[in-house]
Amino acid sequence: MGNTFGHLFRVTTFGESHGGGVGVVIDGCPPLLEISQAEIQAELDRRRPGQSRITTPRQETDTCEILSGVFEGKTLGTPIAILVRNKDTRPQDYQEMAQVYRPSHADATYDAKYGIRNWQGGGRSSARETIGRVAAGAIAKKILQQVAGVEIIAYVRRIKDLEAPIDPNTVTMEQVESNIVRCPHPDYAEKMIALIDQVRRDANSIGGVVECVARNVPKGLGSPVFDKLEADLAKGVMSLPATKGFEIGSGFAGTLLTGQEHNDEFYSENGDIRTVTNRSGGVQGGISNGENIIIRAAFKPTATIGQAQRTVNQAGESTILAAKGRHDPCVLPRAVPMVEAMVALVLCDHLLRDRAQCHLLT
């Protein structure tokens, strides 16, 4: 229950943080798509732990194995299974958490729902689950780029109260990947890195905002009323660990404007209907309008920290916990490829649905 995402392009993730491995089964991928292990690995490398001093020190290569669905470099149209084996596991670091609940983590709610949980690194609630999403997202990105020229770029917009002035319409992947925090503004990137360094030394954590832009998205993706494109984007992004908020276009700031100020006026560009502004964020009436889709996701501070906090054990007795283990002082740098993956999965699924419904007879 709750482990499968999508309608026509369906992904099912599996595995746990300190188990044998994690992975994904992708069903509905069209045949004859050229895809390599290296292309998928490149996305996983952006997500993997231990990539810099401001991420978790857990050392995993996250090397992916394509078990099925790809032959001689092309997809078969059959289920694609991808596996990443866990190597650097330390379940003993979490022994204390077998009985004690981490504040703001999934420990207590998993116990309340299932009556049992894998306490080793959070099990299924760990961010390692997102390996499968990023692997599937690499394939979705390839489909979107090849079919429609879609480009998806996410980046760190804000860490705590440091918000970088970034134009999503011009930002490049090279700018994003030019530093370890994945903020395309070099001056703010230095400040963000320094802040995360300090928080790490304090055995604490901080959160922030990832912004993502999808360019060249075809018009017509999304379906009213319950399958609106922004609704599915929100569901996909908000299903990522540590997310606490979602915005598209003007978002909450749009509530401060009048209708005249907020409306995106239309004009014709060589017969193509465009908008003068893009406060709608590329989606109107739940359907893409051809403008850049711009979304933002709020990520809370990492729940597992080394500072002492009040909590209770499974018996309901009060205790103090200073968590052990290896954790990100800030999830934002590694969340960037995760957000890109979820946006890609949603857009790819809607692209296939749109082609099936609206272009069969045209």
From Swiss-Prot:
Gene3D superfamilies: Chorismate synthase AroC (3.60.150.10)
Catalytic reactions of this protein: 5-O-(1-carboxyvinyl)-3-phosphoshikimate = chorismate + phosphate
GO cellular component: cytosol
Entry EC no(s): 4.2.3.5
Pathway named in the protein's UniProt entry: Metabolic intermediate biosynthesis; chorismate biosynthesis; chorismate from D-erythrose 4-phosphate and phosphoenolpyruvate: step 7/7
GO BP annotations, alphabetical order: amino acid biosynthetic process; aromatic amino acid family biosynthetic process; chorismate biosynthetic process
SUPFAM superfamilies referenced in this protein's UniProt entry, alphabetically: Chorismate synthase, AroC
GO molecular function, one term: FMN binding
The entry's keywords: Amino-acid biosynthesis, Aromatic amino acid biosynthesis, FAD, Flavoprotein, FMN, Lyase, NADP
Enzyme class, spelled out: lyase
Cofactor note: Reduced FMN (FMNH(2)).
Keyword hit for Nucleus: no
Name of one Pfam family that matches: Chorismate_synt
Classification via NCBIfam families: aroC (TIGR00033), PRK05382.1 (NF003793)
Record note on quaternary structure: Homotetramer.
Protein family per UniProt: Belongs to the chorismate synthase family.
Protein name: Chorismate synthase
